[in-house]
Amino acid sequence: MEDQTNYLEIFCYYIEKVYICIRQTLMYKITYAKSNTMNYLVFATAMLPVVVLMYIIYKKDSLQPEPKGQLRKAFYLGVLSCFLSFLISGPLNLLGVFHDNVSTLLDAIRLSFFGAAIPEEIAKFAVLWFFLRKNPYFDEKVDGIVYAACVSMGFAALENILYLYSNIDNFMMVGVVRAIFAVPGHLCFGIMMGYYYSLVKFYPNSKRHTTNCIMVLLVPILLHGLYDTMLFSFKTLHPVAVLVVFVTFLFFCFKMWKYAARRIEEHLARDMNTGTEE
């Protein structure tokens, strides 16, 4: 009887999550049904950074650009991964592994890793693997980065839309902040996942093959978790400490973006010198 009750709680939790997503997505149309101009503006604000970053990544693949249809499929799978992440974070929340209310630094760490980084990056990896496992277009090292970036942008697009629609009164400010930090952050997580994914595929006999297999998930999870921990910890810190953490956060973002850019150039160089063993 107790097991049935637990299953019912989990089922109800998932139904509630789906309902919340649908409600947040439709909330704006219900509240602002008479203002189509505002509707388009909010949607454009959410999507603009995603489109710009996808275009930049697409242009980086200059040797053999990927078919646009394949990129769209990867993007849509990224949107799907947003829902798949609930299948992981839901039970962890019910089990008390993390809580949405953050009052201590430990709460921030648990929410950042178990509520966001781990379930979200695993979900992205799952759809990336499903998409690339027998994909004939995945024939260059940089392709792994391009497709993983598109998956991450699909995830970021839906997340951005939900955030802006749920903060409709301040959507422009929220949109600008997320365009500077959150969306590029997801792009960097995707770049790192794709970087190691390509190393695993194209260098199966490398001495670092096992390490690369681990790094496919470990690196994006660590980057994502540290990124979110600094953001969530603001609520728990003294005002002076908040300033220190904010400066650290800016430095972290700059180094992460620079590091991700170098990884793209590395794979582009490898593709131009095909045959070099890793």
What is each model feature region?
Residues Q4-L8, Y14:
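Short hydrophobic targeting helices and cationic amphipathic motifs
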Residues Y13, Y19-I20, M27-K34:
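Short, positively charged and aromatic/hydrophobic N-terminal segments
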Residues T5, Q24-T25:
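Positively charged, low-complexity intrinsically disordered regions
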Residues Y28-E278:
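Hydrophobic alpha-helical segments at protein termini of multi-pass membrane proteins
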